[in-house]
Amino acid sequence: MKSKKKIVLAYSGGLDTSIILKWLQENYDAEVICYTADIGQEIDRNKIFRNAKKLGVKNIIIQDLKDIFVKDYVYPMIRGHAIYEGVYLLGTSIARPLIAKDQIRIAKKFNAYAVSHGSTGKGNDQVRFELGYHYFGPKIKVIAPWRIWKLKSRSDLINYAKKNKIEIPKDKKGAPPFSVDDNIFHTSTEGKLLENPKNSAPDFIFQRTVSPEKAPNKSSIVKIDFKSGDPIAVNGKKFSPSKLLGKLNYIAGKNAVGRVDLVENRFIGIKSRGVYETPGGTLLMHAHRAIESVTLDKDTMHKKEKIMPRYAELIYNGYWFSKERFKLQRIVDLKRSKVNGSVKLRLYKGNVIIHSRITKSSAYSMKKVSFEENKTFNKSNVERFINFHKKKLK
């Protein structure tokens, strides 16, 4: 007997992907393999196995990618100071390339003819996933249910779930939940009342940060050590990449650090509103910029700042594996070996304040910058410098 074709579905165990699982089974004569990338999201392994097995799935894979995600994706992005449209630290964007890469690995392992994802037809993630799929498995078919099925709204999904006895989760108010994406780097919340920009975000949707009103009335100090541009220790203790970020998430979250409410311009051309929490990532971004300010020369820093918007846009748009992103990463990392030292941050009710910078490889000269008299800086050269630049105004 000829074996069935196989489809590998990026599966979370939640409502959307459980519906997609059932839909694939109904519409394709194929075995569906459920694949979950553990990148530090709030994962319920029992729920994933329970919900998939209810629908007759035999192969359920949960792959631990937390350290790979932080070390090979988050850290390079932090080194590039990637911020989209001034505030977004790209927490969802940076996760998709790794998931797509590993999903294709599983597809090849099982000799699957297709992969599938749960991204909506209006979102950026469909692009991010499918660019990753193409890079690693250009001959593998992509099935994107949201672009082809007849279920066009959340209401349609809920009705389909009821019809097929698929568990429908509830939020804290007992209603169908917001659209939430999370990983060890961030949590995003979208949909429902947030779709109207005039509505403020209710406090109960925040999962990893307290409000400034509930944060301690006393500031906290956190020390982050860097080696070759990457964090290696928090408050003097070394951690693995995922544990280090988890530690910073806890410290920042309890001090109300890392909340962003953003109306962003999606790659596909529409605007969307999302509420993001990136507590540990916010600390890393502040600390990394601070340590670079005393270890890198002016030209290197300015070149990095010049390319940053494009670098961030490439990540946002799903071009992590593009030649252009690789090229910009080489520029970003050109002098990372000099970025060593420690930064202390003071945290208070959502604020992040640089407390101190300490390094043995400093590009900062106290003698040259001092207001006291010194012989290391020739002031007569300044007049010639100014006269030269006056010519540019003629």
Functional labels for PLM-detected ranges:
Residues M1-A10, L15-K394:
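Nucleotide-activated chemistry modules centered on ATP-dependent adenylation/adenylyltransferase
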